[in-house]
Amino acid sequence: MNRRIPVLVLLAGFVVAGIALDRDPSAEEVVAEAQVEQSEFPMAPADTALASTWFCAGGTADSEGFADHVVTMLNTTERSLDVDVTAFPGAIAPPAPNAEADALDPEAGAGGDAESEGEEQAPADDAEGDQTDEAEGGEQTPADDAPVSAEPVERSIEIAPRSRVRLAMTELVTAPVASALVESDGGGLVVEHEVRSIHGIDAKPCATGASDEWHFAWGTTARESRELLVLFNPFPDDAIVEGVFSTEDTVREPGRFAGGLVVPGRSTLGIDLGDDVTRREEVAATLRTRAGRLVVDRIVRVNEEEGDRGLTVQLGVPEPQRAWIFADGVVSDDFRERFVVYNPTEELAEVEIGFRLDRPEENGIPAPVELSIAPGSHATVDMNEDGRLPANVPHSVVVRSANDIPVVAERVLSSRRPEGRRGLSVTTGSPVESPEWTFAAGSTAAESAESITIVNLDPEVLTEVDVLAVVGGQELPVSEMQDLVVEAGERLNLDLTRQIKNRDDLAIVVRATEPIVVERVLAQLGEDQRGLSIGVGVPSPEGARVPADPVDAAADVDLGDELDEAPVT
């Protein structure tokens, strides 16, 4: 069986292009095209690359910020890297007049705000009174009347071999929002960014390329929530952006986006989505440019009095995919798990959500969730309410298009515990498997915890795994985490906090003999702390492949972990 696909490394990103899946004819499987087309899904640049470029769009950089932006840069090579970090301070756009979105569905609006729905939105004036320009398709709306606070600020850093550097954007600029452009003189640089505040923490990979479209399956502008879209244009030319949003009751195109929102060249702009799509429990989003390219992050703070609480950041998806892999998950009295699947295309998407339970010989094999998702709309499945998954049994998940219409999928996992691992984690899955994954951010310092979950989706081939810590200029094997065997179809959770004590500079590399998917959990454990960050790492393009078809065979594995040691509990 050979499902490997070559990955072409470009300065602007990575392309995993048009490779047929060669299947075993004896298995009576059809040969199918399986691609990750023109994807800027973050992948690690090879050590031999001439340069590395990363784009970290989202975060705040002032004393009143709710998502302090910190960039973590890891040099995985044996040589020093010269790195330039450019911080782009930005403004948050004020509400546009009549900011509620216009419903695209003529019958929509039954569940909306009567005073604001259906009203046409006037374009906002910019800071200096410039007139809007005519462009193809209609008027352009200048970004906002709050000018960017300062010019971009650059700092040069030398990162020693196999070392990492953390840089808060507040060290360079003061602004309501700030983005970072990270450039190095060679390959082997992996960059993540974190958002932190009293509301929680989250850490995710930055982008390795810009795009002319970005999609988000999940979002919320409910009364006790705040959703901020951060639009980062690192290029000299202006970008003109349109946006459309799927809510629980309709599809909306806010006036400021319908006319074309201008994001000036070399700037960052924050959009409080609640100004345009007010008080909606569910908001899926698509942003497309008429001109130019962007990087877009979504930051959400949820502070429900008796419900979810936490802080999350997520890079958008530049291209919907046919499959999304989630290595980790659980449903219980303490943990609520939801999946949101969004169809930004113009065709009906038939989707299956398949589950692989730990110890299936004991816990069974659940039937998949089947969804039919209309063009431009989304579906949410609450696994706690669905009832097909046994409580307190960790599992992996594959969200797959059954009719080859690509989709965007996110997992929403929340913990309402009074203490310990609690908070809100929202992430896309991985559209690829890879034999190597890197995590630049991480800590096992006091009142912190870190673990990883590995899933081997191959229905036939086991994989052997090594876990290495990149600390203090060395790449060191983690004790008791070498030559680990993950059988076909199985997953494995590893508690790094047990093996690596009190390291606040912990970066991790996971290497396997076969392609796998790896998720990392970061948690804040202090009595007054809240923070739960779960997401995939940065895969190597070498040996990357798209996932196989689901396997229904039961696996025989005993993880040996108590529930409290599981990655999300």
Residue spans of the language-model regions?
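Hydrophobic alpha-helical membrane segments, chiefly transmembrane helices and signal peptide h-regions
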Residues: 3-24, 83, 182, 285, ...
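Conserved functional hotspot residues at active sites or interaction interfaces
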Residues: 5-13, 17-72, 189-234, 293-345, ...
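Intrinsically disordered, low-complexity Pro/Gly/Ser/Thr-rich segments with frequent PxxP/GP/PP motifs
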Residues: 34-37, 102, 107-109, 144-175, ...
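Short beta-strand/loop motifs in extracellular/secreted proteins, especially
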Residues: 69, 79-84, 178, 187-189, ...
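Short acidic, flexible loop segments centered on an aromatic residue
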Residues: 74-102, 147-150, 185, 231-252, ...
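Long intrinsically disordered, low-complexity regions that are acidic and Ser/Thr-rich
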Residues: 99-144
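Hydrophobic, ordered structural segments
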Residues: 157-202, 276-306, 386-418, 508-529
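Extended non-catalytic domains of envelope/secretory-pathway proteins
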Residues: 263, 268-289, 295, 301-304, ...
